[in-house]
Amino acid sequence: MIENMFSIPIVKYRCTNWKQKKQDFLALLNEQTLTMGEESVYSDYGEYDTLTAEHQMGLYDTPNYLNRIRELLKEEMEWFAHDLNADPQIVRAWFERALYKNHHPPHTHGHGGWSAVLYIEYDPTVHTSTVFVSPFNHFVTGMQLNYMPEVEEGDLVLFPSFILHYTQLNESDVQRTVASFNMTVDMDNIPLGWLTKSNKGDSKQTVIKPLSGL
């Protein structure tokens, strides 16, 4: 008898009322300042309004930015709570936009919790979804195992934060825009790395620079 010792979940939801939510997310994004960082994409990741922890933790006040995202994804978080028998709380959120030749190198979001990506502007004819890298290789060939979910605009993909992942080069002139966030399954289990001021409310990412010419 053959049994599988390990499995890694990934959750995908189609956002309700997406036409309106897309406009709401884009309006929120347009209020932010996106800059190019070491991730080789435009993001507001380091801006103050994206930084948060529950105010009772005594580290940051919860900004309207985060509250708005919580409101927009309230129903989807209720689905996650039901499916995983959890009490999910979004504790950090940011936007990311990839223009021509932009990409996000391989990285993780720390040792615990869940993370998510919401595809806001995404054309499957010219864009590719997030690439997830297995923490173990193929048991026969030893080759690296990758997984790319099939997605479209309005899809919300949630995954364990420790999973290495990246985005491929945007080879088109069509911008690719996502919202990302970190969340905990309940407020008693927030990864400590997300609550340190030096890490701006998030775990310190491990960024692997791409090879020259890629």
Report each predicted region and the residues it spans.
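Short beta-strand micro-motifs in enzyme catalytic cores
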Residues: P9-V11, Q175-A179
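UBC/E2-like fold recognition across ubiquitin and ubiquitin-like conjugation systems
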Residues: K12, L28-E38, F132-H138, E152-E153, ...
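Non-heme Fe(II)/2-oxoglutarate
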Residues: M1-L84, H103, N199-D202, G213
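Glycine-rich nucleotide phosphate-binding loop and flanking beta-alpha elements
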Residues: H165
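Catalytic core of non-heme Fe(II) oxygenases with the double-stranded beta-helix
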Residues: Q89-L158, Q168, Q175, V185-L195
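Double-stranded beta-helix
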Residues: V131, N182-L214
